[in-house]
Amino acid sequence: KKTKAIMPVHLTGRMCDMNKINALAKKYNLGVIEDAAQSVGSKYMNKRSGSFGDFGCFSAHPLKNLNAIGDSGYLTTNNYKHFKKIKLLSNHGMFNRNIVKHFGHVSRMDVLQAEILNYKLKNLNKIIKSRRYNFKLYARYLNKDNVFFPSEKKYQFNTYHTFVVQVEKRDKLQNYLKLNGVDTAIHY
């Protein structure tokens, strides 16, 4: 009864099953707020991440696929009522110079971050193409018996924010790679 929204998190450039999530949200009259921080450009059923729910939340942190040089992010919605409220809240809650309708705060992106993102947005398809090419190379050379990595389903278009593998002897592989000059990290 207290639940107001579902927040699917599209991790590593791979989208959640949005048909199931949206069906559940519709059944229980819940909002959907997509965490698309790691999935900019990813698609599910030929539709981009951040466009399925009431809101799409994106990060432009320097380590993301579409990044700026500082902390920033952006929000998407296709609902005009939501847009107007968010715009109001992001400008101190001020309707105009003299009327404050809600408590708010400044959350505008600075011009430098916006310009960098605008430039990189024009190159997003190249960035994604490069990441997908790298994934195919890794997958080809690591396609061994005991190395598992997520496959792309026919209705998905993954952008591979990270290349995730699962192996039985993780620590041994990580040490071997380190000795051979290859950095790895254990995520989540």
Label for each model-derived stretch:
Residues 5-9, 14-20, 27, 43, ...:
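PLP-dependent aminotransferase class I/II
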Residues 1-68, 74-76, 81:
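Active-site phosphate-binding strand-loop segment of PLP-dependent enzymes
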